[in-house]
């Protein structure tokens, strides 16, 4: 934590007080939460950015979409549109936001929608002729006007919420006690070989903020063994020693760079959800002469429309469980099968 953020601690106390009052009003029913008559699963975190929500949503889509009609509902952060939008063939990353557009491109058999007002978004989805059977709420842990039936709280292994502080001193959107709303906690971005002892130590620390009711799971990021352009694929091992331009506009891109980087590579870092401007594209083209460009899947959906290059590739990732994958799947499926209302 840098010195400037430490000096902002009084504002963190004030912000924590305001969010605690808001949560208290929802908990007491003074502020209303709206439930819906289908399974609604909310995936989110207590902190800002970098916990791996997108691969976790994609895991749930793969788990459930073979049997159920799925819809994802996101805010569509930094999109250049307003209101409720249901993804369609004319949609792009600027209209939907990068993550929803990635869902739409990757999973053509599901419905993808964006709405800042999640209550209105769900109502619009349920008014469709082919309305969804399950709704996955992306980054909605703090969106308390909707009462989801199942809450999955994510926290990154190297940045556990129990060690964090309220904004602006730290990165917490609400106090650690907000974890009590979680039905399940997933520690993301773990070492693949994390020991059982380390897992148990983290579990004991986390459930103290959850009234000991949530089960804790551990996942790691699994990188694909290939990179993909619009029309071809290359093995990662083939390009690892080649001279490359690595580019990321995501929160906490260090592991992405570490996985691909060799001695002669150049890395470009942009803010999370960055809108690539013409000057950015010019700079990328200049630096990428005689090199392949590798970026994240989320950045690829934004860049590919502006950087028409056969040398632009992305590296897909998945969220996989260190252990207890079947146990996780069963809990989700049991909730869906037993849920007729979220009330």
From Swiss-Prot:
Which amino acid positions bind ATP, per UniProt? 47-54
- Cite the SUPFAM superfamilies for this sequence: P-loop containing nucleoside triphosphate hydrolases
Q: What EC number is given for this enzyme?
A: 2.7.1.130
One GO cellular component term of this record is: plasma membrane
Lineage: superkingdom? Bacteria
**What's a single GO MF annotation on this record?**
ATP binding
Check the UniProt entry and state the signal peptide residues, or none.
Answer: none
Which GO biological process entries does UniProt record here?
A: lipid A biosynthetic process
Q: Where are the transmembrane segments?
A: none
Which reaction(s) does its UniProt entry say it catalyses? a lipid A disaccharide + ATP = a lipid IVA + ADP + H(+)
Q: In which pathway does it act?
A: Glycolipid biosynthesis; lipid IV(A) biosynthesis; lipid IV(A) from (3R)-3-hydroxytetradecanoyl-[acyl-carrier-protein] and UDP-N-acetyl-alpha-D-glucosamine: step 6/6
The UniProt keyword set, sorted, is:
ATP-binding, Kinase, Lipid A biosynthesis, Lipid biosynthesis, Lipid metabolism, Nucleotide-binding, Transferase
Task: Name the InterPro entries on file.
Answer: LpxK (IPR003758), P-loop_NTPase (IPR027417)
**Which family is this sequence assigned to?**
Belongs to the LpxK family.
Q: What does this protein do?
A: Transfers the gamma-phosphate of ATP to the 4'-position of a tetraacyldisaccharide 1-phosphate intermediate (termed DS-1-P) to form tetraacyldisaccharide 1,4'-bis-phosphate (lipid IVA).
HAMAP family registered for this protein in UniProt = LpxK (MF_00409)
User: What protein am I looking at?
Assistant: Tetraacyldisaccharide 4'-kinase
């Amino acid at each position: 934590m840098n010195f400037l953020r430490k000096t902002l601690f009084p504002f963190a106390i004030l912000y924590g007080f305001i969010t605690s009052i808001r949560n208290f009003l929802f908990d007491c029913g003074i502020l209303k939460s709206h439930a819906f008559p289908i399974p609604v699963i909310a995936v989110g975190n207590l902190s800002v950015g970098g916990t791996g929500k997108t691969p976790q949503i994609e895991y749930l889509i793969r788990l459930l979409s073979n049997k159920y009609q799925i819809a994802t509902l996101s805010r569509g952060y930094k999109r250049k549109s307003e209101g409720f939008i249901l993804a369609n063939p004319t949609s792009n990353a600027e209209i939907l936001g990068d993550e929803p557009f990635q869902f739409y491109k990757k999973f053509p058999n599901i419905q993808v929608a964006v709405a800042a007002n999640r209550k209105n978004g769900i109502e619009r989805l349920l008014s469709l002729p082919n309305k969804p059977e399950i709704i996955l709420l992306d980054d909605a842990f703090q969106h308390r006007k909707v009462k989801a039936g199942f809450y999955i709280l994510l926290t990154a292994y190297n940045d556990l919420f129990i060690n964090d502080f309220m904004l602006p001193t730290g990165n917490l959107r609400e106090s650690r006690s907000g974890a009590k709303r979680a039905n399940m906690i997933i520690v993301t971005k773990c070492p693949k070989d994390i020991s059982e002892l380390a897992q148990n130590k983290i579990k004991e620390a986390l459930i103290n903020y959850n009234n000991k009711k949530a089960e804790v799971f551990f996942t790691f990021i699994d990188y694909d063994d290939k990179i993909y352009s619009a029309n071809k694929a290359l093995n990662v091992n083939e390009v690892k020693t080649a001279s490359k331009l690595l580019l990321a506009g995501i929160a906490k891109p260090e592991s992405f760079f570490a996985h691909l980087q060799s001695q002669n590579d150049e890395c470009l870092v942009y803010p999370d959800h960055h809108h690539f401007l013409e000057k950015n594209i010019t700079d990328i083209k200049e630096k990428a002469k005689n090199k392949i460009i590798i970026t994240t899947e989320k950045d690829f959906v934004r860049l590919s429309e502006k950087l028409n290059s056969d040398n632009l590739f992305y590296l897909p990732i998945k969220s996989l469980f260190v252990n207890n994958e079947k146990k996780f799947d069963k809990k989700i499926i049991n909730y869906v099968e037993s849920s007729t209302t979220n009330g």
